[in-house]
Design a protein with these regions (language model features):
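Long, compositionally biased non-active-site segments enriched in small/hydrophobic residues and glycine
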Residues: 1-238
Length: 238
């Protein structure tokens, strides 16, 4: 793993192996740091909630006081350092990657284990869900990147790194231009199943592109392709 991680440019692209290895280690780092103090069950519950530990763990691994947490209290005849726990987390991470895919971890690209699924609330899972949904795509990035695509941590070794929260809407605004913005949403602008605009922005969103959204009424009318007219058919009552 070391040569792959040493040559990594820290970009979490879908075609790279290094992000898979990094997140496999990071997945277990908080757990192995506190497991000797809290026990297996509580340590897993703690590590499963990013908001409980992320800033604290990242702070203590670079601060001197962190050595008191990093040392394993169960080994009275030795003092563990961060490198020891990273190696321990890597062994657990390797087993997890193996359980997820059955492949050798050093051949597993990030996109193979980090995907995003667009589902319909009418049928979020089971038979027919793919028909009603918007598709499954490999997803770059993570919860710490621009266009974030974070995953939920669980104690189940077979649970992967599929995306569970994202930056759903992206927007670029020129404050000197009152007529338009550049934006895209992860889906479409209508929630009506089978409508043309239910999922038509997904390909643009997945590719990291933006669309022009007109704000000026005149410009909107210039771009009109279809028009919806709402009328009433209420008869006058005698």
């Amino acid at each position: 793993w070391v040569p792959i991680l040493e040559s990594w440019d820290f970009e979490e692209r879908t075609d790279l192996v290094a992000p898979s290895l990094y997140h496999a280690i990071y997945h277990y780092l908080a757990y192995v740091i506190v497991e000797d103090d809290l026990g297996e069950e509580v340590a897993n519950n703690y590590a499963n909630n990013w908001y409980f530990w992320q800033e604290r763990i990242q702070d203590l691994v670079v601060q001197d006081y962190g050595r008191y947490w990093i040392d394993d209290q169960r080994t009275k005849d030795q003092v563990e350092d961060l490198h020891d726990l990273i190696r321990r987390a890597a062994r657990l991470g390797a087993a997890k990657l193996q359980a997820i895919s059955g492949d050798e971890p050093t051949t597993l690209n990030w996109g193979e284990i980090h995907k995003i699924s667009f589902v319909s609330p009418l049928r979020p899972g089971g038979p027919g869900s793919r028909l009603l949904g918007g598709g499954v795509f490999e997803k770059e990035g993570s919860g710490e990147t621009l266009n974030r695509a974070g995953y939920s941590r669980t104690a189940n070794i077979e649970d992967g790194f599929d995306t569970s929260f994202v930056a759903a809407a992206r927007l670029v605004m020129d404050l000197a231009d009152p007529e338009k913005i550049k934006a895209v949403v992860a889906g479409g602008v209508t929630a009506r199943q089978f409508n043309d605009h239910y999922d038509d922005q997904i390909p643009v969103w997945v590719d990291g592109e933006l669309l022009t959204w007109w704000l000026s009424k005149d410009k909107i009318l210039e771009q009109v392709k279809t028009k919806l007219t709402l009328t009433t058919n209420v008869k006058e009552m005698d």
